[in-house]
């Protein structure tokens, strides 16, 4: 288990990670914007587990307001009730290897989707033709705090 001092030092990196995300928001979101414009979804589904799901829940209201469409967050272990003529999925996994998220990707493969992870090279990115990196890098501690900040 990590020492508390190590975790606290890691948590202190959040402001610089957030600042980098904001500075690089255009290149970081380019693939999402491109897919969104191609699909013009009627519903946007944010799918993840754990900290990723918590970050998605936080982002739902903002995304609804900005995109003016239905935005639904759901756990990757229970993808259900897909609605709309043109649904689109966002699969978020800071660590990039969530088995539930990989399973959800397989179950919804008929729909357009983008994967979002903390690093470019990971299992989830390798199974996606449209990928976005959130810029938090690898999380060396259990709680995905920096990943949460970058995801939101």
Pin down the residues of each PLM region.
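Glycine-rich phosphate-binding loops that contact phosphosugars or nucleotide phosphates
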Residues: 37-152
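Cofactor-/ligand-binding subdomain signature composed of acidic, glycine-rich
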Residues: 1-34, 38-39, 113, 150
């Amino acid at each position: 288990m990590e020492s508390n001092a190590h975790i606290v030092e890691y948590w202190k990196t959040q402001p610089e990670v957030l600042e980098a995300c904001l500075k690089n928001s255009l290149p970081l979101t380019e693939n999402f914007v491109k897919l969104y414009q191609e699909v013009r979804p009627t519903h946007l589904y944010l799918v993840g587990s754990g900290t990723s799901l918590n970050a998605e829940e936080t982002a739902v209201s903002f995304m609804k307001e900005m995109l003016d469409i239905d935005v639904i967050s759901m756990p990757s272990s229970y993808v259900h009730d897909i609605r709309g003529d043109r649904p689109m999925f966002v699969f978020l996994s800071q660590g990039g290897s969530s088995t539930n998220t990989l399973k959800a990707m397989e179950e919804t493969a008929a729909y357009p989707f983008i994967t979002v992870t903390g690093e470019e090279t990971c299992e989830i990115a390798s199974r996606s033709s449209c990928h976005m990196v959130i810029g938090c890098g690898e999380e060396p501690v259990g709680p995905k705090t920096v990943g949460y900040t970058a995801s939101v």
